[in-house]
UniProtKB/Swiss-Prot annotation:
Coiled coil: 283-314
Protein name as annotated: REST corepressor 2
Chain positions of cross-link Glycyl lysine isopeptide (Lys-Gly) (interchain with G-Cter in SUMO2): K88
Transmembrane segments: none
Length: 523
């Protein structure tokens, strides 16, 4: 059986076809094609024989030498025992951590070494220095450098950190891995600017290459030799391609980097920083202090905003005046009566506004108060004052149309009407006596009307008596019976202009009516 056997493949057919096509054109194939063909055929061989087989040792499962090749051996650190209670164990661990700086694993290992004897372990803790599990800044930097060189090969990383165990390296790797994704704003901006600059450089390179053809020499450099041209019908084989080094590899624009956005470099600043070694540290300290002060301002602003937001969430309900749940009461107190009179003086007959001012009275109750207490509080004069203020003329009389519509009359007029009705019922004048001329009227004021002449009673029955006579200037006219003439009236000599319906001079008082009949015999 031959030691080497070639395996036919599709690549050999491709090589033969490419070789057959290139030989007639060039005369002889290139050496590069030959070398690629040899490498390809060498890779496609199957090696058979004892020289290419691995030596497998015999299996010895119970042999102690099976685990002798391992460098790291597991060591039992802790095994619980019923002789040590949980409270005693917690007290021992707390003392070991606070007084001697041991961690839990080291303290339990010491206790297991002394066979769960707490007194011996406490006495022996001071004789040893605990192995530090903390990572200093130098250890972290060395770990990052070693990880960049070796990757996840923790055995090689341990060679750079000999005081760290592999489990400790693995544990720190997973905690360090979580912080790698946190990039600052400056780093992200630098990456963006770097990507843009690379794109601009590539565009400039393409423009520069477009001016010079691939096979022609550069006219600016006469010493440069032209590149060898390939035949048009030549096809490259599957061999390895030569890496062509570009003449624009060391381009100045590609190697130039700019600081991130917001950072500027000035010659004065670089000179000042490089002048003395302490000046750089002082500058950085000043920048750090400014950064800390700005962070404090931001924190104080956040606290202020949060307090204002909490104040706004409460709403304006605490600031609203308390709403009194007043119940409507029909009983009028003295204060409410005085308040109602003042409200009538202010709002007139706007009973809705008056009810809102009082608070515990309805619109109907206010109207009832106005009717009931009109004479007691002289509300008509109060209304006249309010109307005078509204019209702009004090003491304006009530119009005739309003009186006909049922507007209330002034209080003095109503009192006089009552007096006239009372006197007409209680007194009687005999018909046989002719009426004497009226006495001269006393001096009257403008507010009171002139006196009336008391007429005699008619012969009609009491039920058919006429209403008492009124003055001519009154608004209410007497009702006349259908079969009886009106009673005699007297025209007043001086009528007040306020009560007269028609302005102008009036004649002296004269009797109006028919002559009186003889009186009937009294019963």
């Amino acid at each position: 059986m031959p030691s080497v056997m070639e395996k036919p493949s599709a690549g050999s057919g491709i090589l033969s076809r490419s070789r057959a096509k290139t030989v007639p054109n060039g005369g002889q194939p290139h050496s590069e094609d030959d070398s690629s063909e040899e490498e390809h055929s060498h890779d496609s061989m199957i090696r058979v024989g004892t020289n290419y087989q691995a030596v497998i040792p015999e299996c010895k499962p119970e042999s102690p030498a099976r685990y002798s090749n391992k460098e790291l051996k597991g060591m039992l650190v802790w095994s619980p025992n019923h002789c040590v209670s949980d409270a005693k164990l917690d007290k021992y661990i707390a003392m070991a951590k606070e007084k001697h700086g041991y961690n839990i694993e080291q303290a339990l290992g010491m206790l297991l070494w002394h066979k769960h004897d707490v007194e011996k372990s406490l006495a022996d803790l001071a004789n040893f220095t605990p192995f530090p599990d903390e990572w200093t800044v130098e250890d972290k930097v060395l770990f990052e450098q070693a990880f960049g060189f070796h990757g996840k090969c923790f055995q090689r990383i341990q060679q750079m950190l000999p005081d760290k165990l592999i489990p400790s390296l693995v544990k720190y790797y997973y905690s360090w891995k979580k912080t790698r994704s946190r990039t600052s704003v400056m780093d992200r901006q630098a990456r963006r600017l770097g990507g843009r600059k690379d794109k601009e450089d590539s565009d400039e390179l393409e423009e520069g290459r477009g001016g010079v053809s691939e096979g022609e020499p550069d006219p600016a450099d006469p010493k440069r030799e032209p590149l060898p041209s390939r035949p048009l019908n030549a096809r490259p084989g599957p061999g390895k391609k030569e890496v062509q080094v570009s003449q624009y590899r060391h381009h100045p624009l590609r190697t130039r980097r700019r600081p991130p956005k917001g950072m500027y470099l000035s010659p004065e600043g670089l000179t000042a920083v490089s002048g003395s070694p302490d000046l750089a540290n002082l500058t950085l300290r000043g920048l750090d202090s400014q950064l800390i002060s700005l962070k404090r301002q931001v924190q104080s602003m956040k606290q202020t905003n949060s307090s204002l937001r909490q104040a706004l969430e409460g709403g304006i309900d605490p600031l609203r005046p308390p709403e009194a749940n007043t119940k409507f009461n029909s009983r009028w107190t003295t204060d409410e009566q005085l308040l109602a009179v003042q409200a009538i003086r202010r709002y007139g007959k706007d009973f809705g506004a008056i009810a809102e001012v009082i608070g515990n009275k309805t619109l109907t109750q206010v109207k009832t108060f106005f009717v009931s207490y009109r004479r007691r509080f002289n509300l008509e004069e109060v209304l006249q004052e309010w109307e005078a203020e509204q019209d702009g003329a004090p003491g304006a009389p009530v119009p005739m149309e309003e009186a006909r519509r049922g507007a209330p009359l002034p209080a003095p007029a109503l009192e006089e009407d009552d007096e006239v009705q009372i006197t007409s019922v209680s007194t009687s004048v005999p018909r046989s006596v002719p009426p004497a001329p009226p006495p001269p009227p006393p001096p009257t004021s403008l507010s009171q009307p002139p006196p009336l002449l008391r007429p005699p009673l008619p012969t009609a029955p009491t039920l058919l008596r006429q209403p008492p006579p009124l003055q001519q200037g009154r608004f209410l006219q007497p009702r006349l019976a259908p079969n009886q003439p009106p009673p005699p009236l007297i025209r007043p000599a001086l009528a007040a202009p306020r009560h007269s319906a028609r302005p102008g001079p009036q004649p002296p008082p004269t009797l109006i009516g028919t002559p009186l009949e003889p009186p009937a015999p009294s019963l």
